[in-house]
A protein has these predicted regions:
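Catalytic Tyr-X3-Lys loop
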Residues: 110-130, 144, 148, 172
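Amphipathic alpha-helical dimer-interface segment in Rossmann-like NAD(P)H-dependent oxidoreductases
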Residues: 83, 122-141, 180-181, 185, ...
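Conserved mid-core segment of classical short-chain dehydrogenase/reductases
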Residues: 79, 100-118, 141, 161-164
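Conserved glycine-rich cofactor-binding loop
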Residues: 16, 23-25
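Catalytic loop of short-chain dehydrogenase/reductase
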Residues: 101, 148-171, 176-185, 194-202, ...
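Short, small/polar-rich loop/turn modules that mediate ligand/substrate recognition or access, typified
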Residues: 184, 189, 259-262
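Conserved glycine-rich Rossmann-like NAD(P)H-binding loop of the short-chain dehydrogenase/reductase
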Residues: 39-53
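Short C-terminal tail/terminal secondary-structure segment
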Residues: 2-7, 106, 237-238, 249, ...
Length: 274
């Protein structure tokens, strides 16, 4: 990303942004994009070292960032963190759920156990409910805010081996629409970014372990599998980058997207067409 000098004219100038999963690939990229657009960023996640690494990158581009270790699956921990953010910064304008959870992909329905199916469905929906509820309490009081989620084209494209995660992504998109309906009268927007697989994310997210089993069944590495997918299955013959997804998050968190709520943003490079 390009380093900016903060002049108060960024898309998110003066905004307070909370990122859960802030130590991950997408969360870290979003932290940089938000900071470059003028937001004060609060990173939350389970691994302090990874959060600190992202925070150093944010500070290197002149951003203001704070770090807290938070388990997004624990309501009291997330609520307490939201309260601390408001004490420190006065408000919460944006919350991004960029959480990644380990789960099984690549097994056929016949092979998959109930727990393997349920783990991503329960984990991802639980986390988003907890995160959105904690932030929305303050957004309602202040008369506005933006709740951002992430999903994948698995939400709408069926295929063998992806049932649990596909259902989880569909549920996150449904939650986005219902949050928009619940909170719109209070000026709170809800947006979900539907991105296809991001090759760069293999380096610092749970996706390498998830894709490894799928790729191995085809005698491929995760990198080779994604390259083949990009060539065969996307209209643009490529997959999205971390920067592209992060910049989309910054835009939809900003006032320039103030007419958008309950929307699922297609960032699939054409692997799925609306």
């Amino acid at each position: 990303m390009t380093t900016k000098t903060h002049s108060g004219s960024g898309l998110l100038s003066g905004k307070i942004a909370v990122i859960h999963g802030g130590g991950g690939a997408i969360g870290g990229a979003a932290a940089l994009a938000f900071a470059e657009e003028g937001a004060r960023v609060f990173l939350a996640g389970r691994t302090r070292a990874r959060l600190d690494e992202v925070a150093e990158r944010v500070r290197a581009v002149g951003g203001e960032v704070e770090v807290d270790v938070v388990d997004a699956l624990e309501p009291k921990a997330v609520e307490a963190h939201a309260e601390r953010v408001v004490v420190r910064a006065g408000r919460i304008d944006v919350v991004l759920n960029a959480l990644g959870l380990a789960h099984v992909q690549g097994k056929s329905f016949a092979e998959q156990t109930l727990d393997e199916f349920a783990t991503p469905v329960i984990g991802y929906t639980r986390a988003h409910f907890i995160i959105a509820k904690a932030a929305s309490r303050f957004m309602i009081r202040q008369g506005g805010g933006v709740i951002l989620a992430l999903s994948t084209p698995g939400s709408v494209l069926p295929g063998p081996g992806f049932m649990g995660y596909g259902v989880a992504c569909a549920a996150l998109e449904a939650m986005t629409r219902h949050l928009a309906g619940e909170l719109g009268a209070h000026g709170v927007r809800a947006v979900c970014l539907r991105a296809d697989a991001i090759p760069e994310a293999l380096a610092r997210s749970h996706s390498r372990a998830v894709f490894a089993e799928v790729a191995a069944r085809h005698g491929l590495t995760p990198e080779a599998m994604l390259a083949a997918h990009a060539e065969r299955n996307t209209l643009l013959r490529r997959l999205p980058t971390l920067q592209q997804v992060a910049q989309a998050a910054a835009f939809f968190a900003s006032e320039r997207a103030c007419a958008s709520t309950g929307v699922i943003v297609n960032l699939t490079c054409g692997s799925q067409v609306d």
